[in-house]
Amino acid sequence: MIKKEMIAMLLAGGQGSRLGVLTSKVAKPAVAFGGKYRIIDFPLSNCINSGIDTVGVLTQYQPLRLNTHIGIGIPWDLDRNVGGVSVLPPYEKSQNSEWYTGTANAIYQNLEYMEQYHPEYVLILSGDHIYKMDYKIMLDYHKANNADITIAAMPVPMEEASRFGVVVTDNDNKITEFEEKPEHPKSNLASMGIYIFSWKVLKDALIKLKDQQECDFGKHVIPYCFNNNKRIFAYEYNGYWKDVGTLSSYWEANMELIDIIPIFNLYEEFWKIYTKTDTIPPQYIAKDAYIEKSIIGDGTEVYGRVFNSVIGSGVVIEEGCVIRDSIIMNNSHIGKNTTITKSIIAEDVTIGENVELGVGEEAENVKFPKIYNSGLVTVGEWSVIPDNVKVGKNTAISGETTLQDYPNGELPGGGIIIKAGDN
């Protein structure tokens, strides 16, 4: 009989709609990050660094890039005969076939997968957070408290607490109150969406709540267990943790990597972040190029000037270009004499010559002000921007655009271009 002390279930099926055009063709956990990685690399690396060798990755929205990236788990040493990594999409059953309708529903639909390992504990993770955590220490804490559930939590500014599940604890860190995104939070200790369940407690709750519409851990499972007097503890985490679910937080997390002393260090030998790497040549920096305080990916060619930016692999930045405070993802091409300021350029984008991105004053986005609201220019995958155009702040572009899409050669601040077939 196969028996694992703890297995991990990694929720990676989310669309990430608050990232706008960045996730129109790819799931949020598969979005590129830090010039080399994808967001899902961080929880996967945490698992293997914590000694967890059995991970189920639950996918749904736009799964192809994610499936290809994970493969059989070789970069994370998760290509195992017993355990390893398994990609778990919704699958057709003999009856009641359905998509995953909530975080807990997704786990419920994979009870059989978990059962085969006879785990003592199950670790529930989100695939869209940037952080380093030793889950073994959290498990030791769970055991020491004889807990049924342990929730990783961290202090946040009180004004931001209403965005999270909030916990109130006693002097022993036992949770006495739990509220999911309360309007008037009683505490600033926020759930990180990382849970350790004793297996029997998790299984019982999922079965009892199987008919709950859009069953979710924060909204349903935790309150159910709390109301049934389960021992629920908060594991307080004080390291770096970033939910990169908005354009501003995604941009900030990338920019934090290039600080002189980064608060999130990718270069630590004792806690490596693993990823799938392609066989590509080294970067090339031309004689007249200039780079200051930036990350430059493998295979990238720089002929222009780059300041305070994160550049992925296989990017070409032509002569006369000036890139500032921006993220340019893999395999994008920036034409000659183009200026890019505070922008996020997704993968495989082509930008013409003499283009200016991020000019003028900020204006509220005309269509999606809650998404495009941090002064950024956001360009989706496979987009094309023609020569000689100017693009203002709080804008979004997706698709193969032509000069006709830019009246007077300009997309003013707050504007948006989404071509047919892109959303």
Curated annotation (Swiss-Prot):
It comes from the Bacteria. Pfam families: Hexapep_GlmU, NTP_transferase. Its EC number is 2.7.7.27. One of its GO terms (biological process) is glycogen biosynthetic process. Pathway: Glycan biosynthesis; glycogen biosynthesis. It catalyses: alpha-D-glucose 1-phosphate + ATP + H(+) = ADP-alpha-D-glucose + diphosphate. GO terms for molecular function: ATP binding; glucose-1-phosphate adenylyltransferase activity. It is an enzyme of class 2 (transferase). Gene3D superfamilies: Hexapeptide repeat proteins, Spore Coat Polysaccharide Biosynthesis Protein SpsA, Chain A. Involved in the biosynthesis of ADP-glucose, a building block required for the elongation reactions to produce glycogen. Catalyzes the reaction between ATP and alpha-D-glucose 1-phosphate (G1P) to produce pyrophosphate and ADP-Glc. Homotetramer. PANTHER family: GLUCOSE-1-PHOSPHATE ADENYLYLTRANSFERASE (PTHR43523:SF2), GLUCOSE-1-PHOSPHATE ADENYLYLTRANSFERASE-RELATED (PTHR43523). Belongs to the bacterial/plant glucose-1-phosphate adenylyltransferase family. This is Glucose-1-phosphate adenylyltransferase. It comes from Lachnospira eligens (strain ATCC 27750 / DSM 3376 / VPI C15-48 / C15-B4). The lineage of its organism: Bacteria, Bacillati, Bacillota, Clostridia, Lachnospirales. The gene is glgC.
